[in-house]
Amino acid sequence: MDATLSTRRHSHLDSLLIETQRVFEVVFGHPVAQRPSPANAFPNLLLSPKDRRHAAGLMRINHVGEICAQGLYFGQVLVARKQELRRHLLKAAQEETDHLSWCSDRLYELESRPSLFNPFWYSGSYILGVFAGLLGDPWSLGFVVETERQVEAHLEKHLQVLPESDARSREILRVMKVEEARHADQADHAGARLLPSPITGAMAWAARLMKVVAYRI
């Protein structure tokens, strides 16, 4: 009995240490992508100072979006009721980790840095993910659908306003947009419930605030 209890304690401690390391890598470090960056298909052309600052602001927003996606997904995983949903969320989270790494790489190429508020963005999204998960799996999937649809929309806008010569950032966002749409479709087909308009409105308002802040800070 004592040995079993000790094993369980070690198991919980190991899980806590692994989770702490993962959060640190996401928020403060540089997660390693499992796939090469789509940007590698294009040369890293020199941009004008104005275009470079604008591209960096947009890519910082997208980097924050991926920080938020990590928080949302892992908050949901923590309280997911079904193993199938956990697998779905973890698979999507891995693709989001690739996105995060690609955006981080591009930010440094643009001689910029991630948002200083990343711990805040991650914490808020993690809490939202736990809240969504506690509502039940269909509602949790509904948050995935709405989040990914909003991300897809702002990626489309960024594709239109990126500097014309920034092919590397554009290709990253193009691939991300395709994969975000797929995440939304998969969650929808898995039984997502449509979120009430007050919730989707609040999410859109929070996203607008994030974009204003992250573009500069």
UniProtKB/Swiss-Prot annotation:
One of its GO terms (cellular component) is plasma membrane. CDD domains: DMQH. Its EC number is 1.14.99.60. Its main location: membrane. Fe cation 1 binds at residues 66, 96, 99, 180. One of its GO terms (molecular function) is 3-demethoxyubiquinol 3-hydroxylase activity. It is a peripheral membrane protein. Fe cation 2 binds at residues 96, 148, 180, 183. It catalyses: a 5-methoxy-2-methyl-3-(all-trans-polyprenyl)benzene-1,4-diol + AH2 + O2 = a 3-demethylubiquinol + A + H2O. Its cofactor is Fe cation. SUPFAM superfamilies: Ferritin-like (SSF47240). One of its GO terms (biological process) is ubiquinone biosynthetic process. Keywords: Cell membrane, Iron, Membrane, Metal-binding, Monooxygenase, Oxidoreductase, Ubiquinone biosynthesis. Gene3D superfamilies: 1.20.1260.10. It is an enzyme of class 1 (oxidoreductase). NCBIfam families: DMQ_monoox_COQ7. Catalyzes the hydroxylation of 2-nonaprenyl-3-methyl-6-methoxy-1,4-benzoquinol during ubiquinone biosynthesis. Belongs to the COQ7 family. This is 3-demethoxyubiquinol 3-hydroxylase.
